[in-house]
Design a protein with these regions (language model features):
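Short coil/loop residues immediately preceding or within conserved phosphate-binding loops
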Residues: 44, 74, 79, 111
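A short, internal acetyl-CoA/4′-phosphopantetheine-binding micro-motif in the GNAT/acyltransferase core
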Residues: 79-90, 120
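Short hydrophobic/aromatic beta-strand or adjacent loop that forms the aromatic wall/cage
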Residues: 44, 141-145
Length: 169
């Protein structure tokens, strides 16, 4: 398996990985148009996990959220749009992609706080050491805000860093 940044030729496949979850009743062509025009999708950096035959197994989007650090100097990133094709789910590809991407990015810039909004509950991400933020930090009822913090950066349950909590991304 190989981790790499997504290329232009990958985007239709990437977008369709999430059609069942985020299609909201749109036709496939309308859904693709929505994805292609999404500011959120254009502002982040896409990563994919592919097999040795170059088949895309999973994808995710990394957002630089340093604008939330309120001058603390903390490096903050968001992980979003994590998706795997239906027929490849429950085989560990999403977890593998998350771990590899975080490790890859941390080689160049040690990230202090990784945020994500879970649309699938906490269990999947808890296995990857993400913790749900306390209820007073939650900004959505339909998605759970979770964080993975570098040691000694932020104990989610005991203190509050001087940062802004991200809206859904």
């Amino acid at each position: 398996m190989n981790l790499r940044e997504a290329e232009e030729k990958d985007f239709e496949t990437i977008y369709m990985m999430g059609y069942d979850a985020w299609g909201d009743g749109l036709s496939k062509s309308d859904y693709l148009l929505t994805c292609k025009s999404s500011i959120k999708y254009k502002n982040g950096k896409w990563y994919v996990l592919e097999n040795d035959d170059k088949v895309l197994l999973s994808s995710l989007l990394i957002h630089n959220l340093n604008h939330l650090n309120c001058g603390t100097g903390l490096e903050i990133r968001g992980i979003g749009s994590i998706s795997t094709p239906i027929y490849l789910r429950k085989q560990g590809y999403g977890s593998n992609l998350i771990v590899r991407t975080m490790s890859y990015i941390n080689r160049d810039i040690p990230i202090d706080i990784w945020f994500l909004y879970s649309d699938i509950g906490a269990d999947f991400y808890h296995k990857l050491k993400f913790e749900p933020l306390p209820s007073n930090f939650q900004k959505r009822t339909s998605s759970l805000l979770m964080a993975y913090c570098r040691p000694n950066t932020w104990n989610i349950n005991t203190n509050v860093p001087q940062i802004e909590i991200p809206n859904y991304f």
